[in-house]
Amino acid sequence: MPIVSAENQNSWSFSIGQFDVNDSNDSSEIRLERLSGKNMFGDMELIGDMELKPFVGFMMNGDDGKYFYSGLRKNYSISSKWIFTPSFAAGYYDRDSSKDLGHNIEFRSQIEFSRDIGNQNRIGFNLNHISNSSIGDTNPGVESATISIIRPF
């Protein structure tokens, strides 16, 4: 199925939710991302219709932990209204008084299901995992669940 037209535009994604949902010491999370509407590789066909789109973001949790990151995402149209978006990012984590993730370099994998709510705006539900992929002495990882508003600009 073709990707809806909003997917080929630059967008902002604003998310709120819960940081560290699998732990009793969870906290709130807020996130802002800039989503590029352009394929990272332009018109080149590297692996079929890969269309990997870059994004950058900033996350802050209720314990003053901060995560600055950049990555790639791929949109899959499920229907004319629904989109499934897996993504991967790498970034810098400053824990402050938040959970110790074992290293400042952290990687995030995420899945998002979003629905077109009109005027090329979408609302989405996200689940992600952040960990250092064992480059640190410890690798506790953390999961987050958020709701997003995605709006083109």
Which functions belong to the PLM regions below?
Residues W12-I16, P54-V56, F84-F88, S109, ...:
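Membrane-embedded beta-strand positions of outer-membrane beta-barrel proteins
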Residues S28-R34, G141-F153:
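Outer-membrane beta-barrel "beta-signal"
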Residues W82-Q110:
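Mid-chain, well-packed structural core segment of small domains
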Residues N10-W12, K38-I47, S80-F84, N119-F125:
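Repeated loop/turn-to-beta-strand initiation elements of outer-membrane beta-barrel proteins
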Residues F19-S28, F58-Y69, I78-S80, S97-N104, ...:
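Solvent-exposed loop/turn segments connecting transmembrane beta-strands
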Residues S28-N61:
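N-terminal, post-signal-peptide region of Sec/Tat-exported proteins
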Residues R34-N39, K74-Y76, R115, H129, ...:
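Residue-level signature of outer-membrane beta-barrel architecture
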Residues M1-Q9:
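Cleavable N-terminal export/targeting peptides
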